[in-house]
Design a protein with these regions (language model features):
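Interfacial transmembrane-helix boundary/kink motif in multi-pass membrane proteins
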Residues: 94-109
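Transmembrane signal-anchor helices characteristic of membrane glycosylation enzymes that use polyprenol
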Residues: 80-84, 106-129
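Generic alpha-helical structural element
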Residues: 10-14, 43, 47, 108, ...
Length: 189
């Protein structure tokens, strides 16, 4: 139970960070029109996820890919994003957008069902050779070494994929299932 709970909390933290920083970046650039459309929320998540990858890459380059620096950097960016949204929106109620006039339970149930199906697959053992033989070991090496690792016997010795950085962050704060769940949630996009 704690295995899946830690993975779910890790993914929830990544999603919350991504959405919040994406909202702040869109507000700063003037790209929000004040409506809480699903497309705008999705765009906020993707922009914030890109910022998460940038933060992790800078920390990995500086050999600071450890729980304390990663947590401090992401916490600082989250506080700055919240403060900017508070200032620009004028309160908590306006940060999260206007309340919808009528709830959409069917859409929410479909998204929840898709998430549950993907998370069941994410908690199963990894079956793809590529994932087991290459991607997860590289992410584990990044998490263990605290930064980018040079692999001398590869064609490109310094090969840092964005996904490897996110998976190494998920491995630091979650269980072995956290990278799979992050991958499954990205498949929803």
């Amino acid at each position: 139970m704690t295995y899946s709970l830690s993975a779910a909390l890790c993914v929830l933290a990544i999603a919350g960070f991504s959405w919040l920083t994406g909202q702040a970046a869109q507000a700063k650039l003037g790209l929000q029109d004040g409506e809480s459309e699903p497309d705008a929320c999705l765009l906020s998540f993707m922009v914030g996820f890109g910022l998460l990858i940038c933060v992790l890459f800078v920390l990995a380059t500086a050999q600071l890919l450890r729980p304390l620096p990663v947590g401090a950097a992401l916490g600082l960016v989250t506080v700055i994003s919240l403060a900017y949204l508070w200032k620009s929106a004028g309160g908590w109620r306006n940060i999260f957008g206007p309340t919808p006039s009528r709830p959409r339970p069917v859409g929410m149930l479909l998204v929840l069902a898709l998430f549950l199906l993907l998370s069941l697959r994410a908690f199963a053992p990894a079956l793809e050779w590529d994932e087991l033989a290459y991607h997860l070991p590289v992410a584990r090496d990044f998490a263990r070494s605290g930064g980018l690792t040079v692999f001398e016997n590869l064609r490109y010795p310094l090969n840092a994929w964005n996904l490897h950085l996110v998976w190494s962050g998920a491995l630091m704060f979650g269980s072995e299932a956290a990278p799979h769940l992050v991958n499954a949630c990205l498949a929803v996009l």
